[in-house]
Curated annotation (Swiss-Prot):
Source domain of life: Bacteria
Keywords recorded for this protein, A-Z: Antibiotic, Antimicrobial, Bacteriocin, Secreted
Cell compartments where the protein resides: Secreted
Crosslink (Cyclopeptide (Leu-Trp)) position: 23-86
Gene3D superfamilies, A to Z: Bacteriocin AS-48 (1.20.225.10)
Pfam family, one: Bacteriocin_IId
Assigned GO CC terms: extracellular region
Function: Cyclopeptide antibiotic with bacteriolytic activity against the Gram-positive bacteria S.aureus and S.thermophilus, and lower activity against the Gram-negative bacteria E.coli and P.aeruginosa.
Name assigned to this protein: Bacteriocin thailandicin
Annotated InterPro entries: Bacteriocin_AS48, Circ_bacteriocin
Biological process, per Gene Ontology: defense response to bacterium; killing of cells of another organism
């Protein structure tokens, strides 16, 4: 849970969302924390999309918007477990 306090603001506000394996490798968080990030996107997908788009407009977050959209489509198509593994 301690890792999630650091990851959620970075992912949500900073627009640095990447796939779960990249989260674990780049940010040094557990697989559990990465799965929680995927769950947060799945639960609040509209909010995540809005944040990603605003970040894209503000500067440089276009990749983030694409990754969030990809994650959302993977969740719909294959489920949250596959998306977390991606």
């Amino acid at each position: 849970k301690k890792n999630m306090l650091l990851v959620n603001p970075i992912v949500g506000i900073g627009g640095l969302f990447v796939g779960a394996p990249m989260l674990t490798a780049n940010l040094g968080i557990s697989s559990y924390a990465a799965k929680k990030v995927i769950d947060d996107i799945n639960t609040g997908s509209a909010v995540a999309t809005i944040i990603a788009l605003v970040t894209a407009v503000v500067g440089g977050g276009l990749i983030t918007a694409g990754i969030v959209a990809t994650t959302k489509s993977l969740i719909k198509k294959y489920g949250a477990k596959y998306s977390a593994a991606w």
